[in-house]
Amino acid sequence: MVKKIGVLTSGGDAPGMNAAVRGVVRTALTQGLEVFGIHDGYLGLVEDRIEKLERHSVSDMINRGGTFLGSARFPEFKEVAVREKAIANLKKHDIDALIVIGGDGSYMGAKKLTEMGYPCIGLPGTIDNDIAGTDYTIGYLTALNTVIDAIDRLRDTSSSHQRISIVEVMGRHCGDLTLMAAIAGGCEYVITPETGLNKEALIQNIQDGIAKGKKHAIIAITELMTDVNALAKEIEAETGRETRATVLGHIQRGGQPGAFDRILASRMGNYGVKLLVEGHGGRCVGIQNEQLVHHDIIDAIENMRRPEKLELYKVAEELF
């Protein structure tokens, strides 16, 4: 029977992580459990930076961006000896189970602990929206609005100067953030890991647009696909139209979470605790068709695939 639980945030921060921690803490206390916060993710777990949390510990946190528990990249957690030390620290505090809030790397850590017999629940916290088994991740829609706001501002200046603007969006190997921002921001071109980058076709499309009287254009592209500044120089050289690249970077992770992410994070935090109370471990939480669901975390990482957004790419193509 679970009496004490731990909670940590790991990997890249995402708006709504604090709301998720709050959901975990408040629900755990309501259920008569003790709850412990672990600072700086798996690194803090190994270094035993663990403190007991009370209701007041999460007061005024629901509207705050980032994560008050802190986060850190910690690749050494892949090592068995390191994970054994983490479990020893959890047992030292008599913590029976752990809730991990983060992205795919964080899930992998939870999976490894699960395989070692320690019960974990994963909550999807990442702006990339790249986690299988859920329609939305915590922080994604807030980041989407941040990107759209930036695109709107770029359009103002691009149209004033008859300029082509390239905007680089986060997402790593997932194009969801770029695709949705491109549709909502009215971008002329969208380039994601799912579409690939065809420079010749892109330049030809831009030239065709100029020939038809197009005065400016915005290209949305997912990070890590190419050097966007070099791409801007190529486009300018081929089209004769001034072209500039803007890398949005970490601004996409910051800011107050929107209403959707606050509610989603609160629901997921609440649900994660209840799963542990009911005796479930080794699960990850998602939302599908507006309903909270849970999956085997090992199966989610190894076998589940995110559905392709073919219809939305078709919409984007027809609107551009």
Curated annotation (Swiss-Prot):
Q: Which domain of life is it from?
A: Bacteria
Q: Which SUPFAM superfamilies match?
A: Phosphofructokinase
Task: Give binding positions for substrate.
Answer: 126-128, 163, 170-172, 223, 244, 250-253
Which residues take part in binding Mg(2+)? 104
GO BP: any one term: fructose 6-phosphate metabolic process
**Pfam families associated with the record:** PFK (PF00365)
Gene3D superfamilies linked to this entry = 3.40.50.450, Phosphofructokinase domain (3.40.50.460)
Query: Top enzyme class of this protein?
Result: transferase
Give the required cofactors: Mg(2+)
User: Reaction(s) catalyzed by this protein?
Assistant: beta-D-fructose 6-phosphate + ATP = beta-D-fructose 1,6-bisphosphate + ADP + H(+)
- Annotated ATP binding sites: 12, 73-74, 103-106
List the InterPro entries hit by this protein, alphabetically.
Answer: ATP_PFK, ATP_PFK_prok-type, PFKA_ATP_prok, Phosphofructokinase_CS, Phosphofructokinase_dom, PKF_sf
What's the Enzyme Commission number for this chain?
A: 2.7.1.11
Q: What is its main location?
A: cytoplasm
Q: Which PROSITE patterns match?
A: PHOSPHOFRUCTOKINASE
| Location in the cell | Cytoplasm
- The residues that the entry says bind ADP are 22-26, 155, 186-188, 212, 214-216
Q: Which PANTHER family match?
A: ATP-DEPENDENT 6-PHOSPHOFRUCTOKINASE (PTHR13697:SF4), PHOSPHOFRUCTOKINASE (PTHR13697)
By sequence similarity, the record places it as follows:
Belongs to the phosphofructokinase type A (PFKA) family. ATP-dependent PFK group I subfamily. Prokaryotic clade 'B1' sub-subfamily.
Q: Which NCBIfam families match?
A: PFKA_ATP, PRK03202.1
**Function as written in the Swiss-Prot or TrEMBL entry:** Catalyzes the phosphorylation of D-fructose 6-phosphate to fructose 1,6-bisphosphate by ATP, the first committing step of glycolysis.
Assembly and oligomerization: Homotetramer.
Q: What is this protein called?
A: ATP-dependent 6-phosphofructokinase
- Organism this protein belongs to: Aliivibrio salmonicida (strain LFI1238)
Upper classification of the organism = Bacteria, Pseudomonadati, Pseudomonadota, Gammaproteobacteria, Vibrionales
- What would be the name of the gene that encodes this protein? pfkA
